[in-house]
Swiss-Prot record:
Lumenal topological domain: 26-415
Known function: Involved in the synthesis of glucuronoxylan hemicellulose in secondary cell walls.
Molecular function GO terms recorded: glycosyltransferase activity
Assigned keywords, A-Z: Cell wall biogenesis/degradation, Glycoprotein, Glycosyltransferase, Golgi apparatus, Membrane, Signal-anchor, Transferase, Transmembrane, Transmembrane helix
Disulfide bridge map: none
Name of the protein: Probable glucuronosyltransferase Os01g0926600
Amino acid sequence: MAMRLSSAAVALALLLAATALEDVARGQDTERIEGSAGDVLEDDPVGRLKVYVYELPTKYNKKMVAKDSRCLSHMFAAEIFMHRFLLSSAIRTLNPEEADWFYTPVYTTCDLTPWGHPLPFKSPRIMRSAIQFISSHWPYWNRTDGADHFFVVPHDFGACFHYQEEKAIERGILPLLRRATLVQTFGQKDHVCLKEGSITIPPYAPPQKMKTHLVPPETPRSIFVYFRGLFYDTANDPEGGYYARGARASVWENFKNNPLFDISTDHPPTYYEDMQRSIFCLCPLGWAPWSPRLVEAVVFGCIPVIIADDIVLPFADAIPWDEIGVFVAEDDVPKLDTILTSIPMDVILRKQRLLANPSMKQAMLFPQPAQPGDAFHQILNGLGRKLPHPKSVYLDPGQKVLNWTQGPVGDLKPW
């Protein structure tokens, strides 16, 4: 149930809704992104690159899904749907000699707890095993030590394969992946788990499920600030302060009684509808800086309020996050109400028009079947922009750069 707003907030919300309806009537409810970002967002990768998909034993992919179909619906599912997309994509080549990129379809987030949370502890062994397989059955990995290969690693901290930042930093990126291009949800500047050249993508959010919860476009946005989720993680952070670097706790302590803020740990069945009735949707960091809220906010036209210092956002060369979102430093959370109420109305309305652009929403989704401009195509565009590979990535016969014995002893055990 949405909280009751102050008279000032109600007046602002009604004025925003009225102005938005006038824009619809004038055909001005959406706005195309200007400049190169808009062109990049609408690029077509077909004809720009060719990808060879390795045929691995099904134990690395399909059997995992058959064992636990929950993998298909959690926020890490992009690795599964990317594989399915590539198998029927026009950029796929069956001739590895003409490939620009090589893709290894290994699912590293399908080992789930009874509660549906991925356990990343076997992931390094699964990945090493898959790389050993392709390097012994094809010559292409050995030709570059993986520099013309890409992997989808949608864990909390990417190829560091741990859900807690301290442990992820301690592990670092799996040594065998240090020359490959990583396609990952995790993105934070100057972080050991984000290597140079990685492609940052949105987490998976179920497109069909969201589509069934759409409300009429003329529905007024009568909620000023909206958030549903944890503020404290007492199970993993019993003393508090470490989870979300204290930012979520600060949101709760400062604004739990503020009528402008509809915030709660409850997750109502009207969650998606409520986002469509909201002007601002909080997207604070959790254990990692990203979450599906970012996707949901964009799809539902709710201005994302990004509280995650140094975050690297999905497809940042195509999506103008500064123009569609609001960035609030973690230390500035206590001033969140002042920051948001100080944004001029014309700025809010422009952000809403940009968010209403269908190409913006499409870029954040992994639909089945794929559609032009979706997240699959944005990934391919990112790979295409890296071509041609520099000659320096190709090794002399017998030359090795990677150390196969590097890393924690547990990671070296056969899988």
